[in-house]
């Protein structure tokens, strides 16, 4: 009888502890909420992305339970409970703008792209796949990013290097690079900040490093006849509305001239420098 009572007591304690831990994790995962009032009261909240407590200014009313009067209270309530399994789960979540209408550049781990990318956060709500810096995003979801890159075969690279430039559903303006199969090289375009596809690179070097074999092969396979054909194409602004000075070979003028490129689409008679234009279409000049 005594043993049964002890077992029941132990199980009851276990249930209470588990419930407390889950409740703790719930409010420790909540985003920073300043509240609706206009006061300035220093408080602390648990930053689940960085795994530590940080200070913020509380307005004085409303907000949520991730709000502590001092750092010690925050540490005691939340501590460091995030496991790699937790990180893996929220790194899979989509970028969520949230219900507020602010404009805060943030980073999220994009499972489709296999890397951390920028998006615009509204300022409240959302989920844990939301980081203030790309470094924080990589530090948390880096094992996934590293593994995704390691698992990517040349066939994978070849497949997504053929995808078109996709602005995405958000309305930011972030200069990015994509491999343009028509032009046979990496070119700039304007990314909206969220969604899109893996043919999206922060630098032209990243684009070339990933899709370089295609770019190199395209250039190697390009005969003088190919050059002659696209050097005769007209300058095409493209469907995007960016402002990128480029050069094209003007058959009427018999030389390379500048034009304004919109950022995506267009054709292969499009060069970043006048030297590139002359080197490719030199026989016309």
From Swiss-Prot:
Q: Does the keyword Disulfide bond apply?
A: yes
What GO MF terms are annotated?
A: potassium channel regulator activity; serine-type endopeptidase inhibitor activity; toxin activity
Q: Name one Pfam family in it.
A: Kunitz_BPTI
The record's listing under InterPro entries reads: Kunitz_BPTI, Kunitz_BPTI_sf, Prtase_inh_Kunz-CS, TFPI/VKTCI-like
Disulfide-bonded cysteines: 28-78, 37-61, 53-74, 91-141, 100-124, 116-137, 161-211, 170-194, 186-207, 231-281, 240-264, 256-277
Please list the residue ranges annotated as the BPTI/Kunitz inhibitor domain: 28-78, 91-141, 161-211, 231-281
Please tell me one Gene Ontology term that the record gives under cellular component: extracellular space
Question: What residue stretch is flagged as signal peptide?
Answer: 1-23
Matching entries from CDD domains are given as: Kunitz-type (cd00109)
Propeptide feature: residues: 24-87, 146-225
Task: Provide the alphabetized UniProt keywords.
Answer: Cleavage on pair of basic residues, Disulfide bond, Ion channel impairing toxin, Nematocyst, Potassium channel impairing toxin, Protease inhibitor, Repeat, Secreted, Serine protease inhibitor, Signal, Toxin
Q: Does the keyword Disulfide bond apply?
A: yes
Please state where this protein is localized.
Secreted; Nematocyst
Looking at the record's lineage, which domain of life comes first? Eukaryota
* Similarity section: Belongs to the venom Kunitz-type family. Sea anemone type 2 potassium channel toxin subfamily.
Q: Which PANTHER family match?
A: KUNITZ-TYPE PROTEASE INHIBITOR-RELATED, TISSUE FACTOR PATHWAY INHIBITOR
> Could you identify this protein by its name?
Actinia tenebrosa protease inhibitors
